[in-house]
Each structure stands twice: as C-alpha cells, then as structure tokens.
Amino acid sequence: VLDMIGSEHSPGHETNGGSFGQTISQAAGVAWARRRKKEKGLVWLFLSDGEFQEGQTWEALMSMAFHKISNLKIVVDVNGQQVDGKTCDVMNLEPLLEKISSFGACVKQVDGHDLVALNNAFRTIHQDKPLVVLAKTSPFRGMEILEKRYPFLHYVRFKDENENEEFKSFLNDMKLR
C-alpha cells in the first residue's frame, strides 16, 4: 500500500516529488546516475496522467530518450482525474500513448487493474529507451461510493453529517470483507 502522495517515510521511497511534474526528472537523474556508477537494479516511478500537463515531464522524457536511460520503468495511473476535475476538461492529453512514443519512450497501455497485464508490460524489452506503462484505471474501483463525487474526487469535504455517516458506514463495511 502506498501513501496517497508518497513521502520520505513511505516504504521504498528514496525521494518525494515536491511540486507537480518534478518526479520524472528526479527519477531520470537517479536512473542515469546509477547507470553511470554501473549499479544494477531499476528505478520505478509512479505518477498520474495529470502530470503530463507539465512541460518538465516532456523535457524529462526527451532527455531520457536522448541519454538512452533504460533502467527506469514508469507507471502512469491513467484515471482521467486530477484535483480540478477531469483531465480532459483541464487540458486534454490524448492521444497520450502516441505523444509519449513520439518523445522516444517505449509505451505500453494496459488495464491497470489487471496484474497479469501489468506484469507482462513490465517485462517488455525496451533497449536504450525508458519504459512507460499507461495503466488505465477507474478511480471508483472497489469504492463505488466515490462515483457520486465525480468529477471532483480529490480533497473534497463532506457536504453534511449524513454524507459523513454514509462514508463511515461504507468504510466499516469494507473492514468486514
């Protein structure tokens, strides 16, 4: 289980992201440095589709392709959501796969809820290129109660005590499963 926004106390996190869009540059730098030091192992990066609205994300992809950084695997949670609502309403990113490919990355798109598909995508040979796995997910999966909040799912306060109780009841029911 990962924190909503990982930080230095999260298991396996060597760094936290800081401002939106910076993690990809940090991960590229760590992967490049590890390769230069001849260290084995991979750098994994988890980010959201909304981060592709930041120019720094595209610059990092271009740099990774140029420097042939292939010890980096990037998983993008493509759930179409961000703090301000639907990503397509804030700034449409499609066709995301083609755009990322055009920057020199090896890109695979899978059902982000399918662990076998994810595992197969992670095994893709991507010599001299970073691997980007677009994991299409539903932000409601397993928590259909959130659907009525759509498209605003981040940092939303309860409207009233009834809604608060409804969520408490839902969470208590989840503990029984």
What are these regions (language model features)?
Residues 1-66:
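Cofactor-binding active-site loop characterized by glycine-rich and histidine/acidic residues
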Residues 38-40, 88-121, 175:
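Conserved thiamine diphosphate
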Residues 41-45, 72, 127-135:
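Generic beta-sheet signal
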Residues 47-54, 78-82, 114-115, 139:
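Acidic, glycine-rich active-site loops and adjacent beta-strand->loop/helix elements
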Residues 54-79, 132-135:
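A short alpha/beta connector and helix-capping loop motif
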Residues 56-58, 84-88, 143-148:
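Short acidic, glycine/serine/threonine-rich loops at helix termini
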Residues 67-92, 96, 103:
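A short, conserved beta-to-alpha structural element at the edge of catalytic cores
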Residues 115, 121-177:
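Glycine/aspartate-rich loop-and-adjacent alpha/beta segment that forms the canonical ThDP
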